[in-house]
Amino acid sequence: MSLAVSAVCFFILIVFWAVLYLLSRDTLAHLDLPAGQLFGPQDAESKEISKLAVAALNKRLRASAVKHEKLPWKERVLVLRETMDSFFSGAEIVSTLTAVDAGGVLAEWVTAPGVDVSRRLLYIHGGAFFAGSPKSHRVLTSKLSEITNSAVLAIDYRLTPEHSRIACVDDCRASYDWMLKNSPEGVDNLAPTAVFVAGDSAGGNLTLSFLNLIRDNTRR
């Protein structure tokens, strides 16, 4: 058997065992919602409010896209980022915002009045990996702090195309490790009583990727 044929056979064997290994890992299927169950408002009034809000956001985003569609792509990205950050700029929130350096990642603590800061939630915003920030999601993170009775750490992870997607995951890891040792009140030598990771859209994708990283590296 020639050296080239042996190399091909060896490569196929490696791929075969790699596939078997990946298929044998925990799929996290036990965390899925029951078939047919949707995460969202259930009553008619809330569904209508949600529908109108989404329509208003889409209209504003499309208007911005049309207005700047002739710009070079890099300039258009900057405009879309500014537009997204300004979506809820006039909205009132009840939470306190505290800017921090979370292990080298710019972030902000979002803490609703009276929440238990030993309960911490890492929030990873959406925005197609190239837009969004803690500022664009403050209405959401403030409400999350309220309903989960926890301090929310919203991170400003590095975005594409200036950075690679793996940089996004690295920022999630660094800020998560920092969050385990810090609270809105400063360095915390006590382990948090509860830890959550959540995100929307691209942030939801990063959440799943990061949770698998935690699982494979035996992190909390």
Where are the predicted features?
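Short, low-complexity Ser/Thr-rich regulatory SLiMs
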Residues: 109-114, 159
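A structural signal for the main folded, soluble domain(s) of proteins
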Residues: 111-113, 121, 203, 217
